[in-house]
Amino acid sequence: MVCPICNAKTKVGNPCKKHTCKFAPKCSSHTKVAVKKSNIPGAGKGLFARNDIARGETIANYKVGTQKMNHGQFIKKYPTGRATHVWSPAKGIYFDALNLNTSIAGAANRASGNSNARINGGGKMVTKTGIKKGVEILVNYGSSYRL
């Protein structure tokens, strides 16, 4: 497998030269989050803060690295009409983040209680509160979760 180069800039403005095989387009040095084993029993992987993240910061974009589908494509892929990593911002538009090799957004688990992040209308995952280093990022996907 050929790993892409991180698309971030260094502090002096030069392109980063590190490779990133997972969670493109940035390497682990240039992301605010990391994927690790979730604290939620049976959830598998989860998304965690690598450092403290302030309220209102964008931590991922559900439209980057996801598969965009129309309703027909969604039903073909998910015949039951139910999916766990799909966000639907509008009727007939779906973004599938099931492939964690291309989308870090899909690693954020659903909050069963209080969420500390949300997905805005533009698909950006934004912190609702300040999140301390090491804390799992949880999102209330609302009615678009498990469609």
PLM segments and residue spans:
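A generic structural signal for residues embedded in beta-strands
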Residues: 8, 61, 137-140
